[in-house]
Amino acid sequence: MSLIQLSPSNGDLLLINSGSFSTGKVIRTRNELVFYTDQYGNSTGYRWLGNLPHVINGNSPQTDGGISSTSWESYITSNLYDKLKSENITLSGTAHLPTVEVAYGLKKGSLKVWSAGLVSSSSQYWLYTDGTVWSGVGVLGTEPDVPFTQIHLQRDIIKYNYIVQTDGETLINIPYDFTSIDVFINGVLQNSNSGSYKIIQSTIQFSDVLNKGDNIQFYLSNVPISSVRFALSSDLTNYVLKSDLSNTSGANNVGFYPGGTVQDAIVYTTPEMFGAIGDGITDDTNALQNAINFSKNKTLLFSNGKKYRTKNLIVPHPMTFKGLGRRQDGAIIPYGNVSSESFIHTGTLILLTTSSTVTFYDLTVDARGITLSFVDGQRLTGVGAADNNSGVYQSGLQMYNCNVSGFSGNNLYGGGSKSFGILKDCQFESSGKSCVRIDGVDWRISHCAIGRSLESYGIEILNENNFVSNCDSYFNKLSGIFYQQPTGMAFIKLIGNTINSNGQHGISCSLPYAQPAGTVITNNIFWNNSTELTGTYHNIDLNYGRGHIVENNVHKAYQATAGSDSARCGYCINLRNGATLSGFINDAIDPLYSYVIDKINVNSQNFANQNEISIGTGLSLTKTVSSDTSIGIKLNINSESYDRVQINPGKILLGNGSAEPTHGIQQLAAYPGITMGVLGLGVVGNYSSSVFRIGTHRIWSGGDNTLRTKYGADPTSATDGNILSVKVSVPSTATSTGIVGQWAADDTYLYICTAANTWKRVSINTW
């Protein structure tokens, strides 16, 4: 056989002629001799001492690194080489038994070539065809086996370097077994006989302390090599076979830093480990259930591009389901109704019966395209939790970046009295009943797309203190988000959602009685709800509860025009059974297209947005000032410099905008209970539009320069009622200027104006 086929440790004791120096030649072992012929015709063999493999770059040792302890060394002359050949010792790489005997430390002549059928004694050794050496007593077979044992090679020298890390070190552990050692400190050979160091098992103890950075070199002799390329069948207990590593307990045979085995670190399982096919046709129910049963406190990992068809599964313990991305061409799909098997797929596809948390990541559970029943009692829910009847809190499921869609029941049911669940970045579409149904407390639902319920709600919540934020709820048969609190106090937060094109209400909240409301509905956007019958249902419908917080919502339609033919709510906000809001309505509402009927169905609420500010009947307007002369309210026109109206606790002043208001009405302390004019008081005086009343008396201008009065009823014409007589100066003639009803008197006569500019007089007698 070729000695190159022996282990590298064997090859170090052989000499192989690798020809002359030439650029590009590759040196792979220490025992290769490369010859160089000088100018005098002397040929010398050189051996490479540097790193292996080495590619020669030059035509002589001097041009390829030179002669040194880390490059080339002169090893043999051509004369010695020829002498070895004359003694039948070739350097071609063929086996030479005396050389192998020396390498293994065997007695000369004790080594022979293995040949089946020969008989071995205790003093004989055998070289097998793979370069290994064996000993034993018995007949040689076709390959080594009991009772023969392998002899291991003792390599001559191993070099081990150590750099001192800290000042004062005296002990260095050698990670090899050895029988002799030479020690150099910074290139100086140390003498153990003089006490410079001593050997304690595999540790070298120096008599003098070492300094940081000292380079310690150890040359170890007769180091046993443990790599064995062939093992007897009787020795298998000492080794790990490929079959040991590939069986189900193989990971137990591989260590793991800082302790334990690889098996301890493996927290993932896959359906394929339990026989799942994932072709969308094969029934993978048993494989998936077995995988779930095994995965307590582990993660069950589902592959992309595979569809695992299954009947109903039970999850009895905490674990994690992990896919490789929502809607990434891989899913768990229901077995579905199969008429030929008389099988109707009902119940819950993945039912969580554990009281602990089950988590889902990046997983698709998809029933779209699968035949299911939409008859009550035969429906199939996608993922659901068993109801909690224990009377104590139990954790709900957690789901992140998942898609559960297409089921004839609910896509997801959180379980009765299951609490603290989380749904985030998920999609729930196309269910028969409500897409998501929650009957526990303290759930957090955020950034989810939820819609297209064929018969019910997008999100149905039946318990208190839940939070839905930044979700889309769209195209559902009934309301987008439905909350009903059957008993007790009601608490819910609905913030930042988009509620779009639902058949009935956008958001519907129903409390059990007229209690203080714990409802927060803010920063939501409503589009085109009441699609079942436009103008019939409402964007926000609130039943019972005092002080609902409804703020900063946006109410829109697809077509932003008056009389839009896209669906619109009846009222933006509808209050039933005494429900009230906590403060002003400040939602963005446009009267042209946000609603069909009005912004709100009651006039008791206060309203303030871009269109108007309205104080409802349920609230009085109070403005407090510091004194009776402080102005509380001002009214003015943008283009004018002065107020038109000023109101303070004592008066109301009016002006025309060109100067400070100076006249109006007032209450003076000197005249308590009397309203007085400021700089005069007057009316236009027209009988039909501005009659002045004092009690039941009416006073107006007759239009003929007369002032008229009537008692108990409004005048029917300008000349209705009686003329009020007014005393004037005594006329000088019977045709002096005068108005009907005017009169005058002197010591002799009483004068009466009976017609315009017509006077009559009568003599006055002494009293």
UniProtKB/Swiss-Prot annotation:
GO cellular component, one term: virus tail
Keywords: Degradation of host capsule during virus entry, Degradation of host cell envelope components during virus entry, Host-virus interaction, Lyase, Viral attachment to host adhesion receptor, Viral attachment to host cell, Viral tail protein, Virion, Virus entry into host cell
Subcellular location: Virion
Listed GO biological process terms: adhesion receptor-mediated virion attachment to host cell; symbiont entry into host cell via disruption of host cell envelope; symbiont entry into host cell via disruption of host cell glycocalyx
InterPro entries associated with the record: Pectin_lyas_fold, Pectin_lyase_fold/virulence
Entry's family note: In the C-terminal section; belongs to the K30/K69-specific depolymerase family.
Protein name: Depolymerase, capsule K30/K69-specific
Name of the coding gene: S2-6
